[in-house]
Amino acid sequence: MELPQADRDMIHQLAMGMNERNRRQRAKRALQLAERVDEAHREVGRLVAEFRRIDPELERVVLFGSLARSSVTRLSFDIDLAVSTRRYLELLGPALASPFKVDLVDLDTAAPYVLEAIARDGVEKYRAGT
């Protein structure tokens, strides 16, 4: 049994409306995600400056993980930073106070698989003497 044309037209219009609503929702989410990523990059810059203030002998800061790879897909992502410093514990304060979840890794004691991830997709944000 075939649906009457009026019913088919109504179903088509409903589907088109749903598709448009879904498209708008996806566009809104993409914009929110892009804004959140921009905020995170600004926060990385702020953290690097704060780390340098706390430890003038800071050797290196590397961003790694999804933010470094530009592969963030969710609004609830973290910032992965690796540091080479003698004052690692003092740098935890600003990391914990961040509005983002920050995973702070000590390059001198990091597990081999973490060092591999950093070597693979790390983005150096600071190096002493450069």
Regions found by a protein language model. Name each.
Residues 1-62, 68-75, 84-130:
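Catalytic core of pol beta-like nucleotidyltransferases
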